[in-house]
Design a protein with these regions (language model features):
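Short conserved active-site loop signatures built around small residues
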Residues: 165
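Active-site histidine-anchored catalytic micro-motif
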Residues: 168
């Protein structure tokens, strides 16, 4: 069996949008929870959340392409780009058919679901983006990552509620350990 190691990491979190910032925030005991800023919470009992702050997708994806994607894809692309860079993966350094994406998500694109349902209700079905359905399905993120990096191996998205991250890591480890992927 193959030995499995993590060679690159990326992070987009409420306490840092890259691994060094995230790690320093963890060491400093920084809390990522704060008042909800994305919508009016006056009618809700819950007023706090752990929102990602100061994230700029334009560092990773061009404007028009970014507009077609859900925020979940934005965050995943940023974290994956950081991990790919840290691992030193460049075209020609890996076999694309033995390199894949197993992306874990507990739920699909909520932001695009919210905005497109709002359009449907207020402006009618003709105003709903043709990208709405693909972008709200969780496995679209794995597809974006595979296309972006040229990975043509396994590509899927386990969805197993709160265990999803560990599920995806375990699946990736097994794919490498048993020789299906590099």
């Amino acid at each position: 069996m193959e030995r499995v190691v993590i060679t690159g990491m990326g992070a987009v979190t409420p306490i840092g949008n890259d691994v060094p910032t995230f790690w320093q925030s963890l060491k400093d005991g920084k809390c990522g929870i704060g008042p909800i800023t994305r919508f009016d919470v006056s009618d809700y009992k819950v007023k706090l959340a752990a929102e990602v702050k100061d994230f700029d997708i334009s560092q990773y994806v061009e404007g028009r392409e970014a507009k077609r994607m859900d925020k979940s894809s934005h965050f995943a692309i940023a974290a994956a780009q950081q991990a790919v860079d840290q691992a030193g993966l460049t075209p020609g350094t890996f076999n694309p058919y033995r390199t894949g994406v197993i992306y874990g998500s507990g739920i699909g694109g909520l932001y695009i679901t919210e905005t497109e349902v709002e359009k449907l209700i207020n402006k009618g079905p003709g105003r709903v983006s043709p990208f709405a359905i693909p972008e709200l399905i969780p496995n679209i993120v794995a597809a974006h990552l595979s296309m972006r990096f040229g990975f043509k191996g396994e590509n899927y998205c386990p969805v197993s509620a709160c265990a999803t991250a560990n599920h995806a890591i375990g699946e990736a480890m097994r794919a490498i350990r048993h020789g299906y992927q590099d």
